[in-house]
């Protein structure tokens, strides 16, 4: 991976609820120019949003905040092993746990219908008073 163009981002995942020294393990093989998309594991039921936040904080301390992003799983496992869309209140609990962090949603278009996006967006505006800066229209685009 060292020969790949920079920057490069790698998606990482752990099947353990709170893996020990996960941050150090990731650092041991991750090229210096790479960042990580840490998949939270909440959608598959491996961990809670709070557990995912602790792992994210460890990754940020070890790799740097500029090289670490959390990927919010917008789905849940059903009893038959298939997946369903996460309910808006489930997504909101994840967003609350990751407050102040850069969040990407997987798989937004597949698991987040229009009504779910509207509900989460309305909640965000009511709680934070605005749309996230990363979603706002750039100032120079007018």
Task: Give, region by region, the residue ranges found by the protein language model.
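Glycan-processing catalytic domains of CAZymes
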Residues: 1-142
């Amino acid at each position: 991976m060292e020969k790949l163009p920079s920057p490069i981002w790698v998606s990482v995942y752990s099947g353990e609820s709170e893996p020990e020294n996960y941050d150090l393990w990731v650092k041991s093989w991750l090229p210096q120019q790479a960042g990580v998309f840490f998949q939270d594991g909440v959608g598959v039921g491996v961990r809670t949003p709070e557990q995912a936040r602790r792992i994210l904080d460890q990754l940020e301390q070890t790799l740097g905040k500029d090289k670490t992003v959390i990927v919010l799983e917008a789905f849940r496992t059903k009893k038959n092993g298939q997946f369903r869309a996460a309910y808006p209140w489930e997504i909101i609990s994840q967003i609350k746990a990751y407050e102040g962090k850069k969040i990407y949603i997987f798989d937004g278009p597949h698991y987040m219908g229009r009504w779910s996006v509207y509900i989460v967006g309305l909640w965000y505006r009511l709680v934070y008073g605005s749309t996230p800066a990363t979603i706002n229209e750039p100032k120079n685009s007018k």
